[in-house]
């Protein structure tokens, strides 16, 4: 006979032995956190915001399409050659600069208008605006990073166009490559305008708090406002956004005597663009506030005295530069419209 051997008595319930685990609690002191909101922290935040916004534009399908179209137009114009009155001309640098400006102008405007709204509304569209708004950072730093990321995109676009122009010059046997002229023309004629437009469009999107109305007003500021001034025969560079004396390069006298006046107009508009960003920083919607009236109420309470003094100092500087420019263009010199100059 076979039987199962067991040390337990039959018909006796076996209770599971519960092992008591002694939990030991370790007590330690939490580390102290020292929050630093200095210039270094502001710079690190600015770089972070800048690269996030910059890369979001670079990766955008819309930007890639606009980039390809602008490149196609430039390359097609280059292969058209430089023929004047039946004579073929060398691809001189200043001629290529005019070609690049004509090919890139409209596409740069589209990029600035479109992505100014995309950068402002990206966090809200992705439902993470309240998380980003709750982080300890200054609104001015965030908005200035958005504006300069737009400027960075225009620089990348222009560098590519210059590269195409230089390759075209070399392929046609022209070796007098004036890279300094490419750079100076971009700084004098284009870069300042892109900075001003980017800042103004960012402010428009912040103040209006509606992406598509902001698009319309941005286009109106660039194109319709100029038409309105022309209708009333007002031709002042102090009223047209980003305007200044026309600079035309020549091999004999460079950019000419108008360069000095153009720099003063650039300073006048750069100060205006900084004021726009400062105002946008004060009115930036951090939270659920939407109406412009509520924004002004909150701004009066939350904006620090130092920030208000900063705005006031830039306004005073802008007024002083405006007075100097007005005195030189309207008082010392006789103001004449284009029609009067033709007579």
Where are these regions (language model features)?
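Aromatic- and glycine-rich beta-strand/loop motifs that create alpha-glucan
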Residues: 26-67, 288-298
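Hydrophobic cores of alpha-helical transmembrane segments in multi-pass inner/ER membrane proteins
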Residues: 1, 107-114, 190-200, 267-283
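Secretory targeting signals
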Residues: 78-79, 91-107, 144-209
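Helix-loop-helix units of permease transmembrane domains in multi-pass membrane transporters
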Residues: 117-153
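Terminal transmembrane helical anchor/hairpin motif
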Residues: 1-2, 212-298, 322, 327-338
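Hydrophobic membrane-insertion alpha-helices, especially the h-region
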Residues: 311-325
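Hydrophobic alpha-helical transmembrane segments of multi-pass membrane transport/permease proteins
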Residues: 61-83, 103-111, 217-227
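Long, hydrophobic alpha-helical segments
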Residues: 99-122, 126, 157
């Amino acid at each position: 006979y076979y039987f199962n051997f067991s040390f337990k008595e039959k018909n006796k319930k076996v209770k599971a032995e519960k092992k008591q685990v002694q939990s030991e609690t370790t007590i330690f002191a939490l580390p102290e956190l020292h929050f630093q909101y200095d210039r270094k922290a502001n710079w690190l935040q600015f770089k972070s915001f800048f690269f996030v916004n910059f890369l979001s534009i670079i990766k955008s399908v819309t930007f890639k399409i606009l980039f390809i179209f602008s490149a196609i137009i430039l390359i097609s114009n280059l292969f058209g050659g430089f023929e004047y009155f039946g004579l073929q001309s060398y691809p001189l640098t200043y001629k290529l600069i005019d070609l690049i400006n004509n090919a890139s102008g409209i596409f740069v405007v589209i990029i600035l208008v479109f992505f100014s709204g995309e950068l402002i509304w990206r966090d809200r569209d992705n439902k993470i605006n309240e998380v980003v708004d709750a982080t300890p950072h200054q609104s001015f730093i965030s908005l200035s990073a958005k504006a300069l990321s737009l400027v960075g995109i225009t620089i990348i676009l222009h560098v590519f166009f210059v590269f195409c122009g230089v390759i075209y010059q070399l392929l046609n046997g022209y070796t007098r490559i004036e890279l300094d002229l490419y750079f100076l023309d971009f700084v004098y004629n284009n870069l300042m305008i892109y900075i001003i437009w980017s800042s103004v469009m960012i402010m428009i999107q912040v103040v209006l708090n509606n992406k598509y109305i902001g698009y319309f007003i941005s286009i109106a500021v660039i194109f319709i406002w100029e038409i309105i001034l022309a209708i009333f025969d007002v031709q002042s560079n102090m009223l047209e956004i980003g305007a200044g004396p026309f600079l035309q390069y020549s091999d004999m006298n460079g950019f000419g005597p108008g360069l000095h006046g153009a720099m003063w107009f650039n300073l006048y508009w750069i100060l205006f663009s900084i004021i726009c960003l400062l105002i946008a920083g004060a009115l930036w919607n951090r939270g659920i506030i939407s109406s412009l009236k509520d924004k002004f109420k909150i701004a009066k309470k939350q904006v620090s005295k130092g920030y208000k003094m900063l705005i006031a100092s830039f306004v005073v500087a802008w007024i002083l530069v405006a007075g100097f420019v007005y005195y030189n263009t309207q008082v010392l010199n006789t103001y004449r419209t284009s029609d009067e100059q033709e007579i």
